[in-house]
Amino acid sequence: LEAELESPIDELFAQFDDKAIAAASIAQVHRATTPEGAEVAVKVLRPGIEAAFARDLDLARWAAERIERTRPELRRLRPVEAVQTIIRSVEIELDLRFEAAAADELRENFAEEPDFQVPTVDWTRTGRRVMTTGWIDAAPINDITPDTVDAEKLKMIVATFAKVFFLQVCRDGFFHADMHPGNLFVDENGRVSLVDFGIMGRLDKNNRKFLAEILYGFIERDYVKVAEVHFQAGLVPQNASKDEFAQALRSVGEPIFGQSIKDISGGNLLAQLFEITEKFNMPTQTPLLLLQKTMVVVEGV
C-alpha cells in the first residue's frame, strides 16, 4: 500500500485496521479513517496476483484455441472470442484505477436516484493496486428478510434492485456484472448500495434496443415478435425457420409465464435456452457474455 501510494500509511490514514473486513482471490478490503475524519474502505490487490492470473489466462487461451482447431461443432460458441472477453475483463479488474473510474461513472449515472447509492472514490488514495472509497454503513442484502424488515420496506428494496438493474442495462448500457449478495447492501432507510466494481459490462445502443424489444415481447407473449428481433439482430442464422424459432421460444416462455421468480429454476431455464442455441446453430454473442452471467446471478439474489 505504501509503495503504491508513495506515502507512509500513518500519513495516509489516521486509523487503519490491519484485519481485512473482506477478502477474495484478487484483493482484500480494510476499514480505515482519513486524517480528515472520513470513514473509508481500502481495497488492496494481493501480492503476485497478476502473475498468477497471467498463467491461468494463458492456459485458458491455449484451451480455447485447441477447441476451435479440433472441435468444428463447437466453433459456433466462439471459444477464443469468449476467452478474450474474459481476459479483457480480468485485465481491467487487476488495475484498481479502472475499477475506481467504473465506480465514479456508475455513481454519476445514478446521481438522481435517491434509493440507490455508490460509494465516492478518494482519488488521492487510489492507484493501480490500491483503491479507496467512502464507507457504506449498511447491512448485507442476505440479512434483509421478512423477519428483519416490514413487508412494505421489503417491496421497496426489491423494486429498487430491479429498477437499478434494468436502468443500468437498458438505459445506460453500463452495468455491474458481479451483483452477487456479497456486493449488495441495504441501509436502515432501505437504500440499496453496490460495492466492488472490478467486473463491469457494456452494451452498445443496438444491443440495448434489441434486448428491450426481446424482453417486451416475452412480457407480451408475442413470440413471433421476439423471433423477428432475434433475426434482425443477427442472433440466429438467416437460413433458419423463423416460425420454428418462435415455436421454440414459446416452449420456453409459456411454462414460466405468471410464475413467481422463486418457482422458476434458473438452471433448467438456461439449459433449455442452450439447447435452442444448439438446435438453431446460434453463435455465441461475446458482447452479451457478461450480461448473461449477471442475469443468472441476479436471478439468484
Where are the regions that the model predicts?
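Conserved catalytic cores of large enzyme domains
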Residues: 1-301
